[in-house]
């Protein structure tokens, strides 16, 4: 997911390098908070939201998932990385399984997202996406990550 967004900003980093720099894969993949730290080290401005004070370790703004936050970033041309509950999005997987996707647009009450799993672009009803975010937000170090080139 981060690799997709870095590529959007013309920054190429291999999947292997990202995994190595964030300390390897955890039991359930990567933590959004670790991706945020890595993006900061690359010189990006980072917006990171969490709904779990303990897991975020003080590295994210604590707030509940909501549609206006996502739309604000999209309006400014920034892709939005989100951690969602897998079974809500895809109607499959374990009830406690999370997945990270990249939201790239919004049209006709649907969000458009890129799925790092298969690289395909997909659409999802906005209410379903917010439900998937809310159901995963308490189990995630962070549920939303936006990076922006630091222009000085």
Each predicted region: which residue ranges?
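Cysteine-nucleophile protease catalytic domains, especially the papain-like/related folds used
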Residues: 1-68, 76, 143, 147-151
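Short linear motifs in intrinsically disordered
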Residues: 26-28, 101-105
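Noncatalytic regulatory segments and standalone regulatory/sensor domains
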Residues: 48, 75, 85, 90-95, ...
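Charged helix-capping and loop-helix junction motifs
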Residues: 64-66, 95-99
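Active-site-adjacent structural elements in enzyme catalytic domains
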Residues: 68-69, 107
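Short, surface-exposed beta-edge/turn micro-motifs
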Residues: 77-79, 98-100
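Structural motif
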Residues: 81-83
